[in-house]
């Protein structure tokens, strides 16, 4: 099973962030432009939360808040679940399923060094399974 470190080597470590002072509209526009589902929210270079599509769907739309006036900080998820570079992709999947989340910021010594999405996890697991299938096919073919 791959580690978060290995996954980030393939995926890359870039993380899109936004200031807590930004508006929800600013956040949504950046997410749409970058084709991503979340932004890590920062204050004084420190991670203080995450803003996701689900935050918008659950906390802005239904409450009829104005995205141009609502600050991202007001609707972001504060109880951040993170992983470190040494955790496995399987551990990430379990965290995501158990906590009903789609994004995991990756921290190293208190610093944000990447982010993993549910799509990254699924892709990695599929690639690993395909590798094992090919190994089994080769083994079976070699027995004939």
PLM features: residue spans?
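Structural motif
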Residues: 15-16, 38-39, 48, 73-74, ...
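A positional/architectural concept
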Residues: 2-48
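Short, charge-rich amphipathic segments
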Residues: 22-33, 64-75, 110
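Tandem CBS (Bateman) regulatory domains
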Residues: 1-13, 52-81, 88-97, 118-144
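A glycine-centered beta-loop-beta connector
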Residues: 31-34, 39-55, 96, 104-119
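The conserved cystathionine-beta-synthase
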Residues: 18-35, 82-100, 107
């Amino acid at each position: 099973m791959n580690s978060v470190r290995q996954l980030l080597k393939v995926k890359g470590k870039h993380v899109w962030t936004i200031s807590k002072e930004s508006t929800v509209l600013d956040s949504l526009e950046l997410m749409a432009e970058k084709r991503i589902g979340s932004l890590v929210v920062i204050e004084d270079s420190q991670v203080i939360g995450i803003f996701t599509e689900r935050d918008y769907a659950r906390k802005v739309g239904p409450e009829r808040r104005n995205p141009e006036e609502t600050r991202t900080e007001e609707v972001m998820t504060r109880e951040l679940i993170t992983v470190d570079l040494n955790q496995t992709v399987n551990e990430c999947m379990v965290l995501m399923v158990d906590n009903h989340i789609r994004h995991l910021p990756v921290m190293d010594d208190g610093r944000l060094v990447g982010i993993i999405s549910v799509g990254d996890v699924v892709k990695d697991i599929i690639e690993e399974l395909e590798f094992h299938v090919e190994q089994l096919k080769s083994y079976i073919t070699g027995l004939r």
